[in-house]
Each structure stands twice: as C-alpha cells, then as structure tokens.
UniProtKB/Swiss-Prot annotation:
It comes from Methylocella silvestris (strain DSM 15510 / CIP 108128 / LMG 27833 / NCIMB 13906 / BL2). GO terms for biological process: translation. Part of the 30S ribosomal subunit. Forms a tight heterodimer with protein bS6. Gene3D superfamilies: Ribosomal protein S18. One of its GO terms (cellular component) is cytosolic small ribosomal subunit. PANTHER family: 30S RIBOSOMAL PROTEIN S18, SMALL RIBOSOMAL SUBUNIT PROTEIN BS18M. Belongs to the bacterial ribosomal protein bS18 family. This is Small ribosomal subunit protein bS18. The gene is rpsR. The keyword Ribonucleoprotein applies. GO terms for molecular function: small ribosomal subunit rRNA binding; structural constituent of ribosome. Keywords: Ribonucleoprotein, Ribosomal protein, RNA-binding, rRNA-binding.
Length: 80
C-alpha cells in the first residue's frame, strides 16, 4: 500500500512594488548618479526589471537616464 502526500500548493512569491511609483518616490534624473548606480551591475550593465521590480515604463526611463549619464561621462560604460 503506497501513501501519496497531499498535493502542495506552489510557493507564492509576493511581487515587489516599483520603487519609482508612489507619492514620495524619487525622480529619475541622469544627474543623480547615486540613484542610477544602484541599477547597474558590478560589470556596468543595466540590471533587468525582473530583478529590480521596476515597472516597464520606469525601466525605459531609467535606461535612458543611464545612457545619458554614460554619454556625458557621469557613469562608466564598463567597470573592470
């Protein structure tokens, strides 16, 4: 006689909210290098939104601000 365990519900991970939406959320600005550097990996690449939980619209704004800051020399393209 074999016993089967009751089917378990899959682990549910709560979706994180976007850090740029809300009443007192920071504004995305290309001059704010401290804020932008939190969304760049240790290799200098832009971290995807599925990791940072940034909404699609704000991720596009963030990527544009990072690219502007790189072009102006405020952020490096590659970190060695």
């Amino acid at each position: 006689m074999t016993t089967t365990a009751a089917p378990r519900r899959p682990f549910f991970r709560r979706r994180k909210t976007c850090p740029f939406s809300g009443p007192n959320a920071p504004k995305i600005d290309y001059k704010d290098t401290r804020l932008l550097s939190r969304y760049i990996s240790e290799r200098g690449k832009i971290v995807p939104s599925r990791i940072t939980a940034v909404s699609a619209k704000k991720q596009r704004e963030l990527a544009q601000a990072i690219k502007r800051a790189r072009f102006l020399g405020l952020l490096p393209y590659v970190i060695r």
